[in-house]
């Protein structure tokens, strides 16, 4: 008997986005005190206001916040559809990173949520939308997986068994096998080997890099950062026959220590090299390591944390990508512009979404705060 193929995971590229979900903690609706430097509702409101009218956003909030959330939504110049969903039970919402909480598998009208964490949110949404739920038997945060048209890119830390990858690298780890079972697409890993550090050609031209069979990433692999979606974007495009990824290229900014930026750059250069060896085409995009506006900690601005479509909307000339922007609050306009220019150059209509400085101290941005529930078909020929 052949195993029944699971429904495919919702990709990070392809058809037009139809519905997305967000989760807003009660703390976001607390009265802003004059001393508060951050207002997390600003970037969320800007995102909702930047979505086309035919997208519906389902917003989960706890019951006590429903009135405030309704007032706030009413104040936005948003043309997209919005529906508020009260959280089931008495649980609260501890953070807005809905991307991490569950995986969406869907084909046509059949939708299934694979619950990972903060399960009340996935359950409330599924009940409201009539989706099925199942529990994941492996802890894989949505932020540590990018889903391409025919591949998945998973952060190495999620593929490693707790005891490390087995001595015999030819035997996939148990976690690798469980993650593979989530979906029919092949898994590639985001990580680097210590011996790759400092090995990258100065031009960062990976097009000539020898590919290897995606060998089981050996036990000496490390992952840069917490989640792959902090530093890598899937584009849904191919370049020279290889799937094209955007990989962040960090620089120090605003008085941040150049050493921290150089260290992050070494790890991301080495990670880009490993991606190229697995058969990806790589384009680099500049990101600043800059003091967060509330904590002053030097942190990367997550320009790779995007939402995109590859199908062109009616009346448009190019497909849309929504890119987090920071120049409205910090002196980062040039980074906003450089990142827009890169997406424009590879064929997108870039929609900059301002305000993400308000969430940068929490290491998240636009993709982290959203979950795509439904997309139209990828009608590209």
Q: Which residues fall in each region the model found?
A:
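Histidine/cysteine-enriched polar flanking segments
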Residues: 1-381
């Amino acid at each position: 008997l052949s195993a029944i193929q699971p429904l495919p995971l919702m990709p990070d590229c392809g058809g037009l986005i139809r519905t997305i979900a967000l989760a807003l903690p009660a703390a976001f609706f607390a009265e802003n005190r004059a001393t508060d430097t951050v207002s997390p509702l600003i970037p969320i409101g800007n995102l909702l206001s930047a979505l086309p009218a035919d997208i519906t956003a389902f917003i989960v909030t706890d019951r006590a916040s429903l009135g405030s959330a309704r007032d706030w939504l009413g104040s936005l110049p948003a043309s997209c559809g919005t529906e508020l969903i009260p959280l089931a039970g008495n649980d609260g919402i501890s953070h807005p990173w809905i991307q991490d909480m569950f995986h969406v598998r869907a084909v046509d009208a059949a939708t299934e949520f694979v619950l990972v964490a903060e399960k009340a949110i996935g359950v409330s949404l599924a009940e409201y939308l009539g989706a099925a739920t199942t529990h994941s038997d492996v802890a894989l945060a949505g932020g540590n997986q990018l889903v391409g048209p025919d591949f998945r890119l998973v952060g190495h830390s999620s593929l490693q068994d707790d005891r490390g990858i087995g001595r015999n690298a030819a035997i996939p780890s148990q976690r690798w096998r469980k993650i593979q079972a989530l979906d029919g697409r092949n898994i590639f890993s985001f990580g680097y080997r210590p011996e790759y550090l400092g090995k990258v050609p100065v031009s960062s031209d990976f097009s000539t890099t020898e590919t290897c069979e995606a060998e089981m990433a050996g036990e000496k692999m490390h992952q840069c950062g917490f989640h792959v979606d902090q530093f890598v974007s899937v584009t849904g495009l191919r370049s020279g026959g290889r799937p094209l990824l955007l990989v962040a290229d960090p620089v120090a900014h605003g008085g941040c220590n150049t050493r921290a930026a150089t260290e992050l750059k070494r790890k991301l250069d080495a990670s880009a090299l490993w991606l190229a060896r697995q058969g990806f085409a790589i384009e680099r995009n500049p990101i600043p390591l800059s003091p967060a506006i509330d904590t002053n900690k030097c942190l990367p601005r997550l320009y790779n944390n995007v939402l995109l479509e590859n199908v062109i909307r009616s009346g448009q000339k190019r497909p849309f990508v929504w890119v987090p922007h920071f120049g409205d609050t910090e002196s980062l306009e040039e980074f906003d512009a450089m990142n827009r220019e890169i997406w424009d150059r590879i064929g997108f209509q870039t929609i900059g979404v301002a305000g993400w400085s308000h969430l940068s101290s929490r290491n998240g941005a636009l993709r982290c705060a959203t979950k795509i529930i439904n997309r139209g078909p990828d009608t590209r020929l």
